[in-house]
Amino acid sequence: MHAFTTQNPNRMAPTVILEPAGGCLCDQPVHIAVRGLAPEQPVTLRSVLRDEKGALFRAHARYRADSHGELDLARTPALGGSFSGLEPMGLLWAMEPDRPFWRLIKRDVQTPFVVELEVLDGHEPDGGQRLARAVHERHFMAPGVRRVPVREGRVRATLFLPPGTGPFPGIIDLFGIGSGLLEYRASLLAGKGFAVMALAYNNYEDLPKDMDIIHLEYFEEAVTYLLSHPQVTGSGVGVLGISKGGELGFAMASFLKNITAAVIINGSISNIGGNLQYKDETVPSVGINTKRVKRTKDGLKDIVDLLNNPLEGPDQKSLIPVERSDTAFLFLVGQDDHNWKSEFYAREASKRLQAHGKEKPQIICYPETGHHIEPPYFPLCKASLNSLVGGPVIWGGEPRAHAMAQVDAWQQLQTFFHNHLDGKKKTIPAKL
């Protein structure tokens, strides 16, 4: 922690106290307190983060010090601002970008996000005199985690290995379409004892730019590579996928061998965008009807009804044959997902699995939670540009509920993978 204070001749200079002092991992909470204020002093706390492309994310909240001139965000409710009430991590999850339709993304996991925290005198909207300042670093790689770029055959990926010699249970991590290679979820999970491969599948290096056809053999090659790695347990791998990555998780579990466990975050059970192909089998894309795209009062597109119902007519051919799978599934669902009908897809997948005598999957539904369920304390992305439909679309979610869901989902998926990949049986109740 680096703390800077503005001297006040009438009392000790206010100081921001952060624990842990030296920064922490991005999925961990930070304890924020202020000392040296006047008794009952009104102050405004402000947080600022600059992302890798220079966009600023900000939040602020109004507080009142206690009778000793101290302020502890774990005990003191915010009186208003970006959030209100007792929210110890609100200055992080309530951040909003200064650019429209901007999502917080971490490309270089070897450097931290840096958050500047300021204490301002009073409750004025424009902020009073700055009383104290601190800098907090949020890291993406735990000490000892190793980052290994993978360019093996066609596979374009990055493997993150925990400290030690292993072997460790392996997980393949997939993001949505157009993401390229995103590593921040894999790097954090590697700190929990998993060997995690962040796998790109389009829009990266020499991989296809479009998604006209997806060959599952590419993903099979990635599974083979991971299972053959000397530091990965060889019995089977897990798959973690969100959005299009969740849909691909369904496909891998349905067509490929050695997929022991899959966590699907807001994924589709029908194939979307282009043909899905494995050997001599082809699953066509579900149809769309652009007339069903709605407009919000702000002029943004709401595409939740864009896709045809995969249970009707010729669109039934777009269904991924999940009933073939012997994989253990966990479905994490944002009930306010406006990208597509994630809860419907999860429940339909569950019906099809059970109708074929397969294990009932675990479904956890999070109210007021949108499409992009990230690791804990990432701010909600309310809307951003969607290259497939053109222009900005809404993703759904309310900031506080979405933030609480991210904390719970992160714990749930870790527990699920430990149970199914390395035999550490335990359960945690969903908190929502």
Swiss-Prot record:
Keywords assigned: Fatty acid metabolism, Hydrolase, Lipid metabolism, Peroxisome, Serine esterase
Pfam families: BAAT_C, Bile_Hydr_Trans
Catalytic activity: hexadecanoyl-CoA + H2O = hexadecanoate + CoA + H(+); decanoyl-CoA + H2O = decanoate + CoA + H(+); dodecanoyl-CoA + H2O = dodecanoate + CoA + H(+); tetradecanoyl-CoA + H2O = tetradecanoate + CoA + H(+)
UniProt cross-references to InterPro entries, sorted A to Z: AB_hydrolase_fold (IPR029058), Acyl-CoA_thioEstase_long-chain (IPR016662), BAAT_C (IPR014940), Thio_Ohase/aa_AcTrfase (IPR006862), Thio_Ohase/BAAT_N (IPR042490)
Main location: other
Stimuli inducing this protein: In the liver and kidney, by peroxisome proliferator (such as Clofibrate) treatment, via the peroxisome proliferator-activated receptors (PPARs) or fasting for 24 hours.
Domain of life: Eukaryota
Positions occupied by motif Microbody targeting signal: 430-432
Full protein name: Acyl-coenzyme A thioesterase 3
Organism: Mus musculus (Mouse)
Classification lineage: Eukaryota, Metazoa, Chordata, Craniata, Vertebrata
